[in-house]
């Protein structure tokens, strides 16, 4: 056997060791699993485990990962160094071309991962013993360990707080300026699976989903499933998807679904995008919710004013001190939360207010108004945030009257969905290079470079803030503050009621009285 194959076998042994340590691979299945990997490359000269110096050295990488597990955030482990060693050895040995490496790495991690039924059984054991949140933490750690969740990528994304918001620059997410495909739900060529979030994606090689694992969830007596996002926007970001491929919608049942979920996983939030183009998510053809293990800024927003409804004395509706238009329904009663939320929803989707430029339907009778709800549990009981959205367009604002206005497009042009409406902004990766050019020009006292001329608004405001200060740290802080300010103003663009008093008038028209 040549030295090149020795390195390949050593790297496969290291991955088997990793799976035994972190992916619940049963030792009784180790040889069988190893042979499945060998079969991919017609390997038949295996000398046995760890019989060479190379095997031992690669295996040391496993021990490094195991040894550092307690220091890693969330106790995470990733197979990235082992997969890199395998890809390098395999390409050197001529088993595949370098560009084929990611697909083969995904295939191998799929082989090493537990099958969905076994994983669900293990999840239920943890949940029964330690509760729903401990089980979700276990499942998240597993999805990091099997390389479906790209935690290392998430940790590389720039992130900072500014103007009461959290601003991130996502280095992996593509920027979609044209959202027409949202209505089609990201349909897959060939028709299988029907869209990018259908349950049939679990293990599907055609979309590199070999490592995707989902968990069954029951909402309102219906079959749903949970999966974590591979490139999450925040901690333990995931989606809860209707097992049936049915269009997005928000109705009375939606509120009950969200409460069912947070009852089972009380440390998570779960919310729903407005089910309309331009103000919804990128997949409207398949009903789903978004949530995760991190409270977003709007969940912690202060109250501007509080109201009650005579028929529901155990519920309080709070107008939020927030740049967008949002209220929060608070009660220890599930029924009151659902009833009051639906009263507001039904009123809003049919609400017309010409004086404030609000039309519930367009000239062709298409609905334009929707609510985007988000549920959490706190010491006060259930809290259901309701974000008022409207997707009307005009000659002045063809992308949306209540969308980011054109002067802010250099920073953010994509629609503002549930996550950003709640104060966590996901900005495009191009900003890293573009703002780097801006910072360099400010530090050197030069004019705004032509290649970033679209940032003239931000440049002017930065120049005024810095007032001739060329210190690089001060410039970086000023850029962060400017991005936060722009994001805050974008949320103001999305506000359907520009004044809190107008939101109050709307609630009072429904019979709500100031508390």
UniProtKB/Swiss-Prot annotation:
Pathway of action: Carbohydrate metabolism; galactose metabolism
EC number(s) given by UniProt: 2.7.7.12
Cited function: Transfers the UMP unit from UDP-glucose (UDP-Glc) to Gal1P. Can also transfer the UMP unit to GlcNAc1P and GalNAc1P. Involved in the general galactose metabolism, and also involved in the lacto-N-biose I/galacto-N-biose (LNB/GNB) degradation pathway, which is important for host intestinal colonization by bifidobacteria.
Gene Ontology biological process terms from the UniProt entry: carbohydrate metabolic process; galactose metabolic process
Record carries keyword Acyltransferase: no
Major subcellular site: cytoplasm
Keywords: Carbohydrate metabolism, Cytoplasm, Galactose metabolism, Nucleotidyltransferase, Transferase
GO CC terms: cytoplasm
GO molecular function term, any single one: UDP-glucose:hexose-1-phosphate uridylyltransferase activity
Family the UniProt entry places it in: Belongs to the galactose-1-phosphate uridylyltransferase type 2 family.
Catalysis: reaction(s): alpha-D-galactose 1-phosphate + UDP-alpha-D-glucose = alpha-D-glucose 1-phosphate + UDP-alpha-D-galactose
Main EC class the enzyme belongs to: transferase
Protein name listed in UniProt: Galactose-1-phosphate uridylyltransferase
Organism (species): Bifidobacterium longum subsp. longum (strain ATCC 15707 / DSM 20219 / JCM 1217 / NCTC 11818 / E194b)
